[in-house]
Amino acid sequence: MPKISPQEWFKSPLGQYLLTLEYDYINPVVMDTFGFYAIQMGNFDINFLDQSRIQNKFSLNSNHPDLMTSNEALPFDEASVDLLIAPHILEQMIEPYELLKEIHRVLMPEGRLIITGFNPVSLWGIKRLLSFDIDYPWNTKFISLSKIKEWLPIVGLEMVEGKMGCYVPPIQQESWLRKIHTMEKLGDRWWPMLGGFYFLVIQKRVHGMNAIQPLWKKKLIKTPVYSAQRSRTFRLKP
């Protein structure tokens, strides 16, 4: 059995290095997204929604969850979520395509989905192929960018922005990570498709709909939920 869980790995020097890079990519999109409801999925100490201007923000399956749910069935009404962040979620799923379909269901028309995932065509992907390590992330599926791009139009989603990051080799020595950090600029210029992770901004497209003035749903959650950080509860209409 794996000795290191995803939660533990993302607290390691390499995991923190990766999350810091991803935060820098994700934050500008978060700050530029408006609406009523924003969701972050995943077990991370980092809050990707901390700079969001959206009032109602929730985390799923995190160390301090606002909502407890299975990733396969999101507890939200159809077309009710404006922004959903799913960092390194698809690669942990048995059926990642089904999760994309579920995300499409809950997103508003023109709603945004942010995905990050490990790139198999990278130094990280090479280590995964050559490693017998049973710990995260080397025991997960590295889904290729081409496969993601193949799935998106099938489920009604469209990629509007994409970028690679983390060109350093996957080492855990913090001192070495600081020394070779310059590889990020070099990689972005000379081998941009070989980063350790990809960052994608995706939108839900609904043909024939005018998304300028969508009909916002006032209520979101199917059952009342208590949050230690909030005193408000929300309930879906029956």
Question: Model segments located where?
Answer:
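A short glycine-rich, Lys/Arg-flanked "PGG" loop and its adjoining helix->strand segment in the class I
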Residues: Y97-R112
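Conserved catalytic loop of SAM-dependent methyltransferase domains
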Residues: M159-E184, M193-L194
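Short alpha-helix
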Residues: N139-G162
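Class I SAM-dependent methyltransferase SAM/SAH-binding core
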Residues: D24, P28-L74
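Conserved class I S-adenosyl-L-methionine
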Residues: R112-F142
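C-terminal lobe and adjacent flexible extensions of AdoMet/dcAdoMet transferase-like proteins
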Residues: T182-P238
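A short acidic, Gly/Pro-enriched loop at the edge of an enzyme's catalytic core
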Residues: E72-L84
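A short SAM/SAH-binding and catalytic strip from SAM-dependent methyltransferases
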Residues: D82-Y97
